[in-house]
Amino acid sequence: MLLLWRRKTVGLICLFSILLTIYLYVSMYPEDNERVWNSGNADIQRKHEKLNNGGQGRHDFDDDEGAEKDEEDAVEKQNIAAPPLPKSFTTFPDRSKEIEIDTDLLGKINGKAEDDLQVEGYKKYQFNGLLSDRIGSRRKIKDSRNARCSSLTYSDSLPAASIVVCYFNESPSVLIRMVNSIFDRTKPEHLHEILLVDDSSEWSNATDEAIKYREKHIIQWEKVKFLKTDKNEGLIRAKIFGARRANGEVLVFLDSHCEVNEEWLPPLLDQIKQNRRRVVCPIIDIIDAITMKYVESPVCTGGVNWAMTFKWDYPHRSYFEDPMNYVNPLKSPTMAGGLFAIDKEYFFEIGSYDEGMDVWGAENVEISVRIWTCGGELLIMPCSRVGHIFRRQRPYGIKTDSMGKNSVRLARVWLDEYLENFFEARPNYRTFTDYGDLTSRISLRRNLQCKPFKWYLENIYPELLPDNTPNQLNNQILVAGKKYLIKMANGTHCLSAENSQGRIANGNRVEMRKCNHMERMQQWKYSSTNELRPMGSSRMCLDSLRGISVILCHNQGAHQMWQVSNAGKLYSRSVNKCATGSNDVSALSTLKFCSLANSFQFVEL
């Protein structure tokens, strides 16, 4: 009985304590006594959308309407006033080593003061500034590399890099954590210096706190140097400002809201050591602007549309049939622009950035085209990964249409006879004249003996070529049940199924052989389901899944369905490419974008 009485007494005391706590809390915040304070990330999302006034900023650069709207918003939006250092930064955890961080737990909001701090962070940075401050000076992130990356080796004598980081009105915690991620995941011999370039921010919080942090951690931060532009130059000219003051053999440009991953730098430096004309980029992983979680990105390459805006492209699924392609260098027609490495001397040899461009926008596409057409290479390294906070929109406004002006400069200098394609994509810039003097950039192109833009389209990015998809298909050229020689127009060679002693094996290639109407391997029967079957084996079909080959017929159409355009192009809709060939002895038939493919004559037998 005594034990039971004690348990009841303890229970009543606990209940009384809880009720007293609730009473005191409600008394302190009577105006909010019906509000739920323990909001998680769903509540954060709603606040973020509210702060953006329902606006949808761009994540991808291939949204033309979004690009134009972003430009208009940039012109109309005014710079926000300089606020004081967030109170959340006064408890910024300074850690000596990386630890696992539970961002879900840290993201909880308790009380009106924290709620106000969170709202303030979104207004200032367009990401969760409060959560960033709580995460602290360093954290452990997921190693997002493919497992094969850890077995790769690199040269023992790699060049040392100057890392150039430009920022404007940045969060102190994000900037400090980025620098620490570099020190924690970079070998000292690979790092010459880190240049933090303050592009005349409206408030000096990030620089001031980073300087204080360096004073406390002078041994580790010894290689950090602080630079400041005389006036706000914009990202493009701020990068040039930093590059001119760098002393390392290689320049590595990083955005200020990044965290580098394990062994991120050797894959970049190794390619430049092999060929100083190589410009190399990491895979850009995502740091979620709301949850601050580190999210792995797939392997992809940079592309562009006729509006000259950047977009991401994904390699064809057949590319990864070789598992090593998850780690091999990948040629990229363009780069996103914020994160890349380049030999310092080569950067200035090819003209650095176009200093006639303003602030940011299109400079990444311009330098990409220049690299490829003027003798360089642009690669993406899957074993180098850097996380980047993708914000919905910039946290500050600009008073000029920099994206539009810069795109016009790019188009008028580099597009040659394809300039009209740009104006068709962006007709509002056809009469735009305030793009500045182009004389020096045209002279640079001539002095570097750069190839024409047509070469870039045909050899680097044929996806952009006009007429890649046949506009008109002719259903009268091939008739079901008939047999044909498929002969190159104005040529002497025909499509011929590869065989061994007259037998065609599943997966055999298709060769270009001198035409012989008696040769059964050159006779192709067209079926009612648009298949082309070699008479040497009626069970096989011409297939486009892995290039041009002969595969067992599956009667499903898809890669075994062929049509002919009015121009005589043999077209596979499933891969949106056409068969092509040559008159070279024993050449193989391949797939190309239709604008680059040969025309054929279909000779009925």
Swiss-Prot record:
SUPFAM superfamilies: Nucleotide-diphospho-sugar transferases (SSF53448), Ricin B-like lectins (SSF50370). Residues 30-605 are lumenal. Keywords: Disulfide bond, Glycoprotein, Glycosyltransferase, Golgi apparatus, Lectin, Manganese, Membrane, Metal-binding, Signal-anchor, Transferase, Transmembrane, Transmembrane helix. The gene is gly-11. This is Putative polypeptide N-acetylgalactosaminyltransferase 11. Pathway: Protein modification; protein glycosylation. GO terms for biological process: protein O-linked glycosylation; regulation of Notch signaling pathway. It is a single-pass type II membrane protein. One of its GO terms (molecular function) is carbohydrate binding. There are two conserved domains in the glycosyltransferase region: the N-terminal domain (domain A, also called GT1 motif), which is probably involved in manganese coordination and substrate binding and the C-terminal domain (domain B, also called Gal/GalNAc-T motif), which is probably involved in catalytic reaction and UDP-Gal binding. Residues 329-391 are annotated as: Catalytic subdomain B.
